[in-house]
UniProtKB/Swiss-Prot annotation:
A Pfam family the protein falls into: LptD
Signal peptide location: 1-24
Subunit structure: Component of the lipopolysaccharide transport and assembly complex. Interacts with LptE and LptA.
Disulfide bond residue pairs: none
Gene name linked to the record: lptD
Keyword Membrane: yes
Function: Together with LptE, is involved in the assembly of lipopolysaccharide (LPS) at the surface of the outer membrane.
Name under which the protein is recorded: LPS-assembly protein LptD
Location within or outside the cell: Cell outer membrane
Organism per entry: Vibrio cholerae serotype O1 (strain ATCC 39315 / El Tor Inaba N16961)
Length: 783
């Protein structure tokens, strides 16, 4: 063997050029550096100033040279220059042209691609290369293929004639794209196909005259790889997405979604970035739905914006609208934020300073129910102007603040008034705190003025003009005690007792409508809030002491493993206890609220539990409760959950805003569910969920997913069965029957070249198939 290392090709073979034929030395210098094997991605390595001047190393069994013209190496030939490596049976070096021609079992790599060809020609000065009858594989991106002719015309730029490309590994021809010509630019991460056809297991499935696709993660205009699916709701579906890189600050993705039973839907997402923030516009349009011809064209639209301008202004917009109320139940859609059967339509502009902020808010909605005049419809906010002032540490241990807003409420609800509300709320706070405890005393004055339009109002208690002033005094204190546990080694336990006194005088408020006030969640932490409602239309009177404690356990790494909290309210005025407001209650009046208990548990990071309960000792009844238990390992999880709300509790807490409780629920809420997901093997995974209503003895929903994921494609199967409505009133009619919607679907798609697993494949979560209930982790330990 012989090894040559010079600064220029001519110098590397100069000794051989003086003789017409020479036998290369058979000995090898074992101390020389190991030559690179060409199997690594080297595209990000810095390039030399003059690549053609790099040293060349040649290994061969035999060398023949013609003076001043060429040198021919044969027998186990390896030529290395910088990142380029050629191995072949024969290699000819043309000195004058600085060209290498390799023939016979040619293997080439340059840190970006490796190939196996019958012949290769490399122009060392220009970095140009041609390959014939080639199998190739990219080293910096997933991808391989075959070609009759491959030409490299620049750094990471390739032209492929009569070739194919796939992201599948060697030996797997599940799919490939064939074309008469393919241009691949790894710098731009884009591939251009001429006369392409997609083959699945060597069978052509579609043809296009021209196609560009991205082959990386950067933004490039072109087709994204399509997905195919079948569902009992829409029949066969085929989606072809196209990405448009319009400018550095905005782009567009359009998707043609063909549905066998409905027609072709055009979906688009336009994204932008400006000095005022970032946003996106989503649209979906289905011309003349063939499954529901009476509905005609069906569409959906959403505009979202969120941004900060000049560090003081913040702009937020979320506006959604659909063509009809059944749009989301008939079509899979990613448009809109839905709450309680409504599409949110709101915009907010906020200005913030060091000590104050002001905001203008407009909120509307689109109802997704048939009843557009019900008395339970929410109010539109048209608009609300707020101003808040903060003066922390005005003096030592003294904070001042002011909350104020002017709001206009409008509604289409039958018998409900519109109104203008002005609210001013100054506050004073005296905080004390140290490492082991805190004590805060707060005083506020809530002044509110209402001008109510009563023309269409049926509630005789309401008054046109109302002025309400209510003081509020609150004092809350807590301490943190800590010790090393006795029974558990290396564990630390805390005990955190807490107490609060709250006084709000009783004030007649039945002459005021409910505009934006909703009941806040009631749990252990809610015992120590000053407000029962989120808005100011109802200021719940109070003369009460809340007390409770929590204890936490931390392991040696100070990771929280167990948290138990319990507490109760003692009403100094028993008539203020909500439990005493039910006229149908037969129990004696009590001065105590139900006990609220919360518990979170994490055992060895694989068994998790969260539970909460409110138990009324006087009535010996559970008012509400929830419980979640989850077992999780690296390959999957199983979770069981249950929630319960007593009907009397619903009546006592929200009876003012919902008057037809007896028509909505028979025995309150009692629902159980189980969810599971498991990686069956490296390629197979499954997930599912089941929810059951114990008050109606009917299933709410069940869903099952099964997915196969290979290295370059996936297929997902989904079956769902959802309770959509009832034939009759299930509360009052014993013969009412449930109406279910069944749907089976499968999705198939490509992985690689910048694509990922699609929605609905069952790999993006058990809630990816449009089901209303999904997986969540309601565990609140500090981990």
């Amino acid at each position: 063997m012989s090894c040559f290392s010079r600064t220029f090709l001519a110098a590397s073979i100069s000794a051989a050029l003086f003789a017409p034929q020479i036998q290369a030395e058979a000995s090898v210098d074992d101390n020389r550096a190991q030559l690179p094997n060409g199997e690594q991605c080297l595209v990000n390595q810095p390039e030399p100033t003059n690549p053609g001047q790099q040293p060349i190393n040649v290994e061969a069994d035999k060398l023949e040279a013609i003076n001043g013209q060429k040198a021919t190496y044969s027998g186990n030939v390896v030529v290395v220059q910088g990142k380029k490596r050629i191995a072949a049976d024969n290699v000819t070096l043309h000195q004058q042209e600085n060209v290498v021609v390799a023939e016979g079992n040619v293997q080439f790599s340059d840190g970006e691609i490796k190939t196996h060809s019958t012949k290769a020609t490399n122009h060392l000065n220009t970095d140009e290369m041609t390959l014939e009858n080639t199998r190739y594989q990219f080293l910096c991106e997933p991808g391989r293929g075959e070609a009759v002719y491959v030409s490299k015309t620049g750094k990471a730029v390739y032209e492929i004639e009569d070739g194919s490309i796939t992201s599948c590994p060697d030996g797997d021809n599940a799919w490939r794209m064939r074309a008469s010509s393919i241009d691949v630019d790894q710098n731009e991460e884009i591939a251009t196909f001429y006369n392409p056809r997609l083959e699945v297991q060597n069978v052509p499935v579609f043809y296009l005259p021209y196609l560009t696709v991205p082959i990386g993660d950067t933004r490039k205009t072109g087709f994204l790889y399509p997905t195919a699916s079948y569902g009992s709701r829409n029949g066969y579906s085929f989606e072809v997405p196209i990405y448009w890189n319009l400018a550095p600050q905005y782009d567009l993705e359009t998707t043609f979604n063909y549905m066998q039973k409905r027609g072709t839907q055009l979906n688009s997402v336009f994204r932008y970035l400006t000095d005022f923030g970032a946003g996106q516009i989503k649209s979906e349009y289905l011309a003349d739905d063939q499954l529901h011809t009476e509905l005609g064209d069906r569409w959906a639209f959403q505009y979202e914006h969120n941004g900060i301008f000049q560090q003081a202004w913040k702009f937020e917009i979320d506006y959604s609208k659909v063509s009809d109320i059944n749009y989301f139940s008939d079509l899979d859609s990613g448009v809109g934020n839905r709450e309680d059967g409504q599409l949110i339509q709101e915009g907010r502009a906020t200005y913030r300073s060091d000590n104050w902020d002001s905001a203008l808010l407009v909120r509307d909605f689109q109802l997704l129910t048939k009843d557009t005049t019900s008395t339970n419809l929410p109010y539109r906010l048209m608009p609300q102007l707020s101003y808040n002032y903060y003066a922390p540490e005005t003096m030592k241990y003294l904070d001042l603040d002011l909350v104020s807003h002017v709001s206009r409420f409008e509604t289409d609800a039958r018998g409900k008034p519109s109104a203008t509300r002005v609210h001013i709320e100054p506050g004073l706070k005296i905080p004390f705190s140290n490492t082991w405890g805190n004590w805060t005393t707060e005083a506020r004055v809530l002044g509110t003025y209402y001008q109510q339009d009563l023309d269409k109002t049926t509630d005789a208690k309401l008054e046109e003009s109302v002025t309400r002033v209510i003081p509020e005094i609150r004092s809350v204190a807590g301490i943190v005690l800590e010790r090393d546990t006795v029974l558990l080694d290396d564990y630390t336990q805390t005990l955190e007792p807490k107490i609060q006194y709250l006084y709000v005088p009783e004030k007649y408020q039945d002459n005021i409508g409910l505009y934006d006030s909703t009941l806040l969640q009631t749990d252990y932490y809610g015992l120590f809030r000053s407000r029962k409602y989120s808005g100011v239309d109802r200021i719940e009177s109070a003369n009460q002491v809340s007390y409770g404690a929590s204890t936490r356990f931390f392991d040696s790494n100070y990771k929280e493993r167990l948290n138990i909290a319990f507490g109760q309210i003692f009403y100094l005025d028993s008539k203020l206890n909500p439990s005493n407001k039910n006229p149908d209650s037969t129990s004696d009046k009590t001065s105590y609220s139900a006990w609220a208990v919360e518990m979170d548990f994490n055992f060895a990071d694989y068994l998790f539990y969260h539970g909460g309960i409110q138990y009324d000792i006087d009535s010996q009844a559970v008012q509400l409760g929830n419980s979640t238990l989850e077992y999780r390992v690296a390959s999957g999880y199983i979770q069981a959950n249950y929630r319960y709300v007593a009907k009397d509790y619903i009546r006592n807490t929200v009876g003012d805003s919902i008057t037809n409780i007896d028509d909505i629920t028979r025995d309150g809420i009692s629902q159980a569910g189980i969810l599971a997901g498991y990686q069956l093997s490296r390629k197979w995974s499954a997930s599912g969920q089941y929810y059951y209503d114990l008050t109606t003895d009917e299933a709410l929903e069940w869903l099952a997913n099964l997915t196969y994921t290979s290295d370059c494609w996936y297929v997902g199967f989904t079956y769902s069965n959802q309770l959509k409505s009832w034939n009759g009133n299930f509360v009052t009619d014993p013969y009412a029957t449930p109406i279910y919607e069944n749907n089976f679907s499968f999705n198939i798609g490509i992985i690689g070249f910048g694509t990922s697993i699609g929605a609905g494949s069952s790999m993006t979560g058990v809630d990816s198939a449009g089901n209303s209930l999904g997986y969540g982790r309601p565990f609140f330990l500090n981990n």
